[in-house]
Curated annotation (Swiss-Prot):
Organism: Escherichia coli (strain K12)
Pfam annotation, one family: Transket_pyr
Effect in UniProt of substituting residue 313 to A: Mild reduction in growth in presence of acetate or glucose as sole source of carbon
Lineage summary: Bacteria, Pseudomonadati, Pseudomonadota, Gammaproteobacteria, Enterobacterales
Regulation: Inhibited by oxaloacetate.
UniProt protein name: 2-oxoglutarate dehydrogenase E1 component
Impact noted for substituting residue 313 to Q: No growth defect in presence of acetate or glucose as sole source of carbon
Gene3D superfamilies: 3.40.50.12470, 3.40.50.970, Multifunctional 2-oxoglutarate metabolism enzyme, C-terminal domain, TPP helical domain
Catalytic activity: N(6)-[(R)-lipoyl]-L-lysyl-[protein] + 2-oxoglutarate + H(+) = N(6)-[(R)-S(8)-succinyldihydrolipoyl]-L-lysyl-[protein] + CO2
Subunit comment: Homodimer. Part of the 2-oxoglutarate dehydrogenase (OGDH) complex composed of E1 (2-oxoglutarate dehydrogenase), E2 (dihydrolipoamide succinyltransferase) and E3 (dihydrolipoamide dehydrogenase); the complex contains multiple copies of the three enzymatic components (E1, E2 and E3). Interacts (via N-terminus) with SucB, the E2 component of OGDH complex.
Disulfide pairings: none
Modification sites for O-AMP-threonine: 405
Cofactors: thiamine diphosphate
Record annotation: effect of changing residue 404 to A: No loss of AMPylation by YdiU
Length: 933
């Protein structure tokens, strides 16, 4: 420390003496992460003189060295008295730290040897003024976890290289937590795990299976797409080792998400799918009742896997070709399972997501998902993230084209996840890293990355020719032995297994494939989880369901959720809202939207049905209407009345989400597909922003049941309505959802009264059918004086897919019927009343899909004589329901009647940006709909 900039400053500062140790610790934190210290201290440390001063060593290591040295009387005089030795000791500790920080840059990670990183100067002893003459000198090793307090420099250097520059490259010094860093150091510096002969033979057998399946498929179905794992074969022993280790650590469920690369191999060699079933899929055979189906490398699978610690249930999530989107779906599924156990931080459920090197750094949903990893409503106790890093994305292999970071896994540093790079040609290193990563996740409940550095033996798919764009890489690959061959040769040299043993493994596996039965010894038939979905099969949208709540109980619930303890100091406007709700409960006021919605949740949790509501502002509601969560104005605490109904109630969980649409909606889809007993709701801040999650809507929500047989009762609340707020705050793009509707795949509703939203939400939870519900929820109607409902309408009513004329018009005098949905109804109603018109009836369609033909025919029955029908909408002609639903409108109006459009003209933008233009357009469309010539 004689040359330390910090020491020079302390010697000339009044901040010394008793404060010196504290300041040294603060400076050590600054060296690790400048942002971790207060801005004033950071500014002070940054101003320390740098000229002629070598990089500072962590002072705790130096202090520890001298502390140990002082206790060693036999060496005290000879060591302490030599100032040169003291300086070199500090340099040795600097060298150790350099390997911890940057040793991974010299690690032997690339099986092909093509990936050459720049030399790191501070890994060379000479950088620290240490020469070969010092190699035989003995130095204290500080906190280096070798099991020794002192080592010769040459021995220490070799240990550092083996630890940090071998087939494993560890990145963890970016982590702020000292405890986590020391835990990792202890595990990796204390020596690699040793494996017995049986374990090594098992690794060889699993590599044999990985290679054997790919070769078998290549021979049996030449040219067919299978997205081979070859080159990354170590994924199979990695996954099986992780499942075994997880089972021994108390895990009872593992949920996997992965893309196409190696998926068929995982299905057969990990989850135990019968090879014959896979062969049938290659041959084009399929079961007729499974809907449209999907390609084989998108299909999911479930099974049980026997470990020494007990059975582990495995679930591989279904996924589309859209890379990385399955990751938040998996996390949502895991959170649902943990909530079912009521153990949100339990190790009983393990999420494993498998990524590609190009996709993990290229797809923004990865960042969104990582950002959720420690958020209260979304955390799952950490995810093990495996990157199959075959160093090429389709045809892009130059890192300068693929990313802007040295490693594809650098994104993991945003959540301070440790990153373990490992050479996929070394299955023992892979197994060591697998156990290490899982133990870290289980210990610290954090995400962890494994970068499985490998290669892709064939093209992106088997019909592709990769040498056109990667000539040098594929010249090397053609000459490179397979991972199985490399490891078989190694075990022969170790006299663990002969080449004859290895050949026998190959033959036995091929025979097992010929037989077509399960090839996974640990596979067991599923004996749990199968009950979950049976009550929800074979239901229709319009079937009867138990909907009634006794008036007395409804009043009790309304009173309970509007009563707040005196200790909770409410904000004045919130107090006014809760006062109004007490009046609603007493029958003194009609229910507004927020009151009816909250009461719907209360009735459900009262019956033991859990409710999960999430969105960017869901606790309060974007438009200040819900206030399910009350914020105490005196101390900042929160109170949720819906969580205080009675002890045996269903859980009510409301979460203000991270600012994301894509990952959060995918998470909620995963949650809903894993837990049908919960009413799962995602609310967009504005419906306009939901298209940030369009891939989730297109690939999962609208089509998941037809492609994969996956039912989902997710509710999407999308605030929608034209109120002059411009093109980004007016439209939830109703037309896009209607365009996706077919085969009764989902429901699209536009409720217009508090009673309707009350019954709609209850119907979604109580009815047996589990299909997505897309709701064009209101904004201005939340406080509209006409958009109110009585307690009797809540108690005795039901959801009406169509609502007829409410004013007392003489049907015989009606010349025109205007059909509409949503807020525009009230504009039409008020204008008609203002005009004192009696010749125009207004009919609301509250459910646009599945279209309520029967209900509409009943509503229109009294207008059978009318020949003039109008569809009125706020949206432009090319948007809204007109184009997608007019064939339904025509089907329910009387034969021979005409149908005309009243609404905004076609527009490239959803809405105008000028209030005056908006108001004129709105008045024009209302007048157009009502004016009878």
């Amino acid at each position: 420390m004689q040359n330390s900039a910090l020491k020079a400053w302390l010697d000339s500062s009044y901040l010394s003496g008793a404060n010196q140790s504290w300041i040294e610790q603060l400076y050590e934190d600054f060296l690790t992460d400048p942002d971790s210290v207060d801005a004033n201290w950071r500014s002070t440390f940054q101003q320390l003189p740098g000229t002629g001063v070598k990089p500072d060593q962590f002072h705790s290591q130096t202090r520890e060295y001298f502390r140990r040295l002082a206790k060693d009387a036999s060496r005290y005089s000879s060591t302490i008295s030599d100032p040169d030795t003291n300086v070199k000791q500090v340099k040795v500790l600097q060298l150790i730290n350099a390997y911890r920080f940057r040793g991974h840059q010299h690690a032997n990670l690339d099986p092909l040897g093509l990936w050459q990183q720049d030399k790191v100067a501070d890994l060379d002893p000479s950088f620290h003024d240490l020469t070969e003459a010092d190699f035989q000198e003995t130095f204290n090793v500080g906190s280096f976890a070798s099991g020794k307090e002192t080592m010769k420099l040459g021995e220490l250097l070799e240990a550092l290289k083996q630890t940090y520059c071998g087939p494993i490259g560890a990145e963890y010094m970016h982590i702020t937590s000292t405890e986590e860093k020391r835990w990792i150091q202890q595990r990796i510096e204390s020596g690699r795990a040793t494996f017995n002969s049986e374990e090594k033979k098992r690794f060889l057998s699993e590599l044999t299976a990985a290679e054997g399946l790919e070769r078998y498929l290549g021979a049996k179905f030449p040219g067919a797409k299978r997205f081979s794992l070859e080159g990354g074969d170590a994924l199979i022993p990695m996954l099986k080792e992780m499942i075994r280790h997880a089972g021994n650590s108390g895990t009872r469920e593992v949920v996997l998400g992965m893309a196409h690369r190696g998926r068929l191999n995982v299905l057969v060699n990990v989850l135990g799918k019968k090879p014959q079933d896979l062969f049938d899929e290659f041959a084009g055979k399929h079961k007729e009742h499974l809907g449209t189906g999907d390609v084989k490398y998108h299909m999911g699978f479930s099974s049980d896997f026997q470990t020494d610690g007990g059975l582990v249930h495995l679930a591989l999530a279904f996924n589309p070709s859209h890379l990385e989107i399955v990751s938040p779906v998996v996390i949502g599924s895991v959170r649902a399972r943990l909530d079912r156990l009521d153990e949100p931080s339990s190790n009983k459920v393990l999420p494993i997501t498998i990524h590609g090197d190009a996709a993990v750094t290229g797809q923004g949903v990865v960042q969104e998902t990582l950002n959720m990893s420690k958020a209260r409503g979304y955390e799952v106790g950490g995810t093990v993230r495996i990157v199959i890093n075959n160093q090429v994305g389709f045809t892009t292999s130059n890192p300068l084209d693929a990313r802007s970071t040295p490693y594809c896994t650098d994104i993991g540093k945003m959540v301070q996840a440790p990153i373990f790079h490992v050479n996929a040609d070394d299955p023992e290193a892979v197994a060591f890293v697998t156990r290490l990563a899982l133990d870290f996740r289980n210990t610290f409940k954090r995400d962890v990355f494994i970068d499985l550095v490998c290669y892709r033996r064939h093209g992106h798919n088997e019909a592709d020719e990769p040498s056109a764009t990667q000539p040098l890489m594929y010249q090397k690959i053609k000459k490179h032995p397979t991972p199985r061959k490399i490891y078989a040769d190694k075990l022969e040299q170790e006299k663990v297994a002969t080449l004859e043993d290895a050949t026998e493994m190959v033959n036995l596996y091929r025979d097992a494939l010929d037989a077509g039965d399960c090839v996974v010894a640990e596979w067991r038939p599923m004996n749990m989880h199968s009950f979950t979905w049976s009550p929800y099969l074979n239901h229709e949208w319009d079937e009867e369901y138990p909907n009634k709540v006794e008036m007395k109980r409804l009043q009790e619930l309304a009173k309970r959720i509007s009563t707040v303890p005196e200790a909770v100091e409410m904000q004045s406007r919130v107090a006014k809202i809760y006062g109004d709700r007490q009046a609603m409960a007493a029958g003194e006021k009609l229910f507004d939207w927020g009151g009816a919605e909250n009461l719907a949740y209360a009735t459900l949790v009262d019956e033991g049905i859990p409710v999960r509501l999430s969105g960017e502002d869901s606790g309060r509601g974007t438009f200040f209407h819900r206030h399910a969560v009350i914020h105490n104005q005196s101390n900042g605490s929160t109170y949720t009345p819906l969580q205080h109904i009675h002890n045996g109630q269903g859980a009510f969980r409301v979460w203000d989400s991270v600012l994301s649409e894509e990952a959060v909606l995918a998470f909620e889809y995963g949650y809903a597909t894993a837990e049908p007993r919960t009413l799962t709701i995602w609310e967009a801040q504005f419906g306009d922003f939901a298209n940030g999650a369009q891939v989730v809507i297109d690939q999962f929500i609208s089509s998941g049941e037809q492609k994969w047989g996956r039912m989902c009762g997710l509710v999407m609340l999308l605030p929608h309505g034209y109120e002059g707020q411009g093109p980004e705050h007016s439209s939830a793009r109703l037309e896009r959802y209607l365009q996706l509707c077919a085969e009764q795949n989902m429901q699209v509703c536009v409720p217009s009264t508090p009673a309707q939203v009350y019954h709609m939400l209850r119907r979604q939870a109580l009815r047996g059918m589990r299909r997505p519900l897309v709701v064009m929820s209101p904004k201005s109607l939340l406080r509209h004086p006409l958009a109110v409902s009585s307690l009797e309408e809540l108690a005795n009513g039901t959801f009406l897919p169509a609502i007829g004329e409410i004013d007392e018009l003489d049907p015989k005098g009606v010349k025109r019927v205007v059909m509409c949905s949503g807020k525009v109804y009230y504009d039409l109603l008020e204008q008609r009343r203002k005009n004192n018109q009696h010749d125009v009836a207004i009919v609301r369609i509250e459910q646009l899909y599945p279209f309520p033909h029967k209900a509409m025919q009943e509503v229109l029955q009294q207008f059978a004589h009318v020949k003039d029908f109008v569809w009125c909408q706020e949206e432009p002609l090319n948007q809204g329901a007109w184009y997608c639903s007019q064939h339904h409108f025509r089907e329910v109006i009387p034969f021979g009647a005409s149908l005309r459009y009243a609404g905004r003209p076609a527009s490239a933008s959803p809405a105008v940006g000028y209030m005056s233009v908006h108001q004129k357009q709105q008045q024009d469309l209302v007048n157009d709909a009502l004016n009878v010539e």
